Curated annotation (Swiss-Prot):
Record protein name field: RNA-binding protein Hfq
Single GO cellular component term: cytosol
Signal peptide (UniProt feature, chain positions): none
PANTHER family xrefs: RNA-BINDING PROTEIN HFQ (PTHR34772:SF1)
Record's compositionally biased regions (Polar residues): 96-106
Function description: RNA chaperone that binds small regulatory RNA (sRNAs) and mRNAs to facilitate mRNA translational regulation in response to envelope stress, environmental stress and changes in metabolite concentrations. Also binds with high specificity to tRNAs.
Organism of provenance: Acidobacterium capsulatum (strain ATCC 51196 / DSM 11244 / BCRC 80197 / JCM 7670 / NBRC 15755 / NCIMB 13165 / 161)
């Protein structure tokens, strides 16, 4: 069994584009468009480099991050079936279905 802690999709995406030095476009909530490569990131900010210039961008100001190529080929979200979580059943387990107006208590 894999004992590594699950990494959230945001960290997985940002870390992949950082390691691969993939050019990205960041759109801020104000509508400003920034381009460059991620040098680093933490819980609250992203360090973007473009033309040897660094910009520290606070995550609360970011609306969208767009990569110039496909980054996440599989579903890397924590808690998704196939990644350490049990499969999600589209129907309730037997004996748990109730009809409208029916009480489930004893």
């Amino acid at each position: 069994m894999d004992n590594k802690p699950a990494q959230n999709i945001q960290d997985t995406f940002l870390n992949t584009v950082r390691k691969d030095k993939t050019p990205i476009t960041i759109y801020l909530v104000s509508g400003v468009k920034l381009t460059g490569k991620i040098r680093s990131f933490d819980k609250y900010s992203v360090l973007l480099e473009n033309n040897s210039q660094e910009q520290l961008i606070f995550k609360h100001a970011i609306s969208t991050v767009v990569s110039s190529r496909s980054v996440l080929h599989g579903d890397h979200r924590p808690g998704v079936a196939g990644h350490g979580a049990p499969p999600i059943s589209p129907t309730p387990p037997a004996g748990t279905h109730s009809t409208p107006g029916e009480s489930s208590g004893a």
